[in-house]
Every structure is written in C-alpha cells, then in structure tokens.
Amino acid sequence: VIAYLHFQKESYVQHLIHEFKYHKNERLAIYIGRLAAEDLQRDGYLTDVDLFVPVPLHPRKMRQRGYNQSERVARGMASVCHHPIDTTSLIRHTYTKTQTRKSAYERSQNVKNVFSVAHPERLAGHHILLIDDVLTTGSTLLNCIDALRDVPDLLISIFVVSTVI
C-alpha cells in the first residue's frame, strides 16, 4: 500500500480530502493525482502497473456526490503516466451509508460483499493499481480485493491519497 499523505484531524490534509470529497472540488482531486503520479513515477513505483482501478461508488452515491473522487485521483495520475483507467470492471452493487463515524468492526460489516467484478477478463493477467482516497481500517480495500480474488493472474497494488494515523 502506498499512502501519499498522512491524515490527521484538523490538519491541512483533512481539509484537502474534505474539499475534493465533500465540497465538489474535482480539480483538486485531479491535481493531487497528478502530483502523486509524478512522485511515484520518478521513484519507479508505476513502471509495471498496467491499469488504474479506482474504488467504485454505488450509483446512488455517485448521483449524490456528482463524481467519484477516487476516479478523479486516478484521472490525474493517468494524465502523467498514461495508464488506462478501468471504471467498469469492479462495481459496487450495494449502497452503504458513510463510514466516517463507524468503528472498525462496523466498517468491516458495512462493506462486506458490496463489491463484485463485472468484467474479469479485462483484468486477468494484469497488474492493477487499486486507487482510493482514504485508508482508515482497510475494510473497503480488503473487500475490493476479496471481490477480485478469482480473477486469474491478477496482481494488485494499492494507492491511497492518505492514511489515517
């Protein structure tokens, strides 16, 4: 797991995350993705990645928010290193409420079995970079990985904009 920033309450990182996640600042998410990709590419972390896969939002959440912040981060990263983005193979088929005030156990239960793979053939044999905005307990990412488990010859790396300290 590569975490670009460290999230602490009342910090500038919290402000940045809230800006692009809750205040519709899509361009900030794209910009952070570009900055991260420049650093990761310079340090050789993206050389063998084939495909970016942002953690999907449920369609209802997508309508509420207007965009997927993880997809916007991926778009910024792709503008630097020109990797394709797959937004249709991994899907979130169950709507869940926000995890921000849930315990680790509640988070794990909240996202259990909410992801599935619609197009495993698009991912088979590839090295993907699974992209999310914030890593807190890892429940969301672990459930994404669980959904991807049966895709043949799939290598998964993970990038998050920030991790909670």
Describe each PLM feature range.
Residues T87-I165:
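PRPP/pyrophosphate-binding module of the type I phosphoribosyltransferase fold
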Residues N25, D48-V49, I85-D86, I156-S157:
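A local structural micro-motif
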Residues L51, C81-I91:
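A short coil-to-beta-strand element that immediately follows conserved catalytic motifs
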Residues E38-R42, R75, S79, L142, ...:
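Short, well-ordered alpha-helices that flank and scaffold nucleotide-derived cofactor binding pockets
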Residues V1-G76:
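Extended interfacial segments that mediate partner engagement and assembly in macromolecular machines
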